[in-house]
Amino acid sequence: MTSESGTTTVHLAVYDTLADWETGHATAWLARAGHTIRTVGPVAGEPVTTLAGIRIVPDLALDDLRPEDSALLILPGAEKYDEGDELAPFTAKARAFLDAGVPVAAICGATAGLAREGLLDDRRHTSAVSFYLAATGYKGAEHYVDADAVRDGDLITAGPTEPVAFAREIFARLGAYEGKRDAWFRLFHDSDPAAFAELNG
């Protein structure tokens, strides 16, 4: 479950208006699988506030984040992705990660940020709905897939209502829960009681 660089550290981007529900399945279960989760914000030590009003103090400043020190960058959605270009540095960092062969996972509003950055122009992807991304003026509409979550190489995308499918694709890319991902998904997505025994067997 280590990246090609040998690290098991997963970096979670945090910023004001972050959508709290979108990344919890992924981060909690990656931590249970042995990954270290570190938060990355605009400024290290300067709190950000989520949609729920929860304050998070980032471990690391975005400027100090290097792809070679990471197994994965997760970009949660946030209202600020639809309010201007304040979060553009995060999608620029996503480009640096992808250029370095390090995976990026983006959900909800973060997919619009990737679209504006041009990172969806030639990759299969999804989001909330196709016309949400079309409004960005991006050139990748032909690669839009109407699915819960989509993994194309090192890029994972999902819409805001699919945090479980989003997590499943992240696990698959990092090789977590081999042989148990289907049971995990059925338990948390479908509330299948039989999956509990499979997951914990």
Predicted regions and their residues:
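Short N-terminal binding/cap micro-motifs at the start of the first secondary-structure element
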Residues: 18-23, 47
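Membrane-interfacial amphipathic helices and adjacent loop/beta segments
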Residues: 39-40, 45-51
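Short gly/ser/thr-rich secondary-structure transition/capping motifs
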Residues: 52-60
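Active-site-adjacent pocket-lining segments in enzyme domains
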Residues: 2-19, 28-42, 59-105, 109-201
